[in-house]
Amino acid sequence: MDIVTAAGGTDPEPVPVEASFDEFVTSGGADLRRALTARYGVEVGVEVTADVFAYAWEQWARVSAMANPIGYLFRVGQSAARRYRRQPVVLPIAHAPGEPDFDPRLPHLLERLSDRQRVAVVMVCIYDWTYPKTAQVLGVSESTVRTHVRRGLQTLRHGLGDAE
């Protein structure tokens, strides 16, 4: 159904706000959750993700018009995380059946990386995100992501005794 505008033209019927928000959460929500969980750990990351989606819903008219809403909401998540008690990031050690085994020192070594290095390494090497996608979500340049990944992997290799 088309809507007749005041100028006499027709516009397609607008997409309901709920539908566009649901589509956004479905398409980008997992990426945002993964980025926030990689940054803040499972417990805080999940809580912050919920806070961010609540904020996005309240501000949907403004957020939906942004060129990079995921990147913006990641920054909102950084601010929201400040409300949570400062705790060291605890990465889960258990992994799903069928996943490759990993060195049990790895979670501890990941915790020792800088926040930016850890997020970049997890997004690129564990979640298999591209450098451009990671850069977009984090709101940094692709070369910054490459640098963080390179330095993070170098630190991990050194810690595991596999220095190149």
Regions found by a protein language model. Give the residues of each.
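Short, small-hydrophobic-rich alpha-helical interface motif
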Residues: 32, 36, 45-56, 134, ...
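Residue-level preference for hydrophobic side chains embedded in well-ordered alpha helices
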Residues: 24, 28-32, 36, 52, ...
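A short pre-motif secondary-structure segment
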Residues: 120-124
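Short, charged helix-capping/linker segments at alpha-helix termini
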Residues: 13-23, 33-51, 61-67, 164
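Short helix-coil-helix linker/hinge
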Residues: 100, 110-118
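DNA-recognition helix of helix-turn-helix
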Residues: 78, 138-164
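Arg/Lys-rich amphipathic alpha helix in sigma70-family domain 2
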Residues: 58-65, 75-94
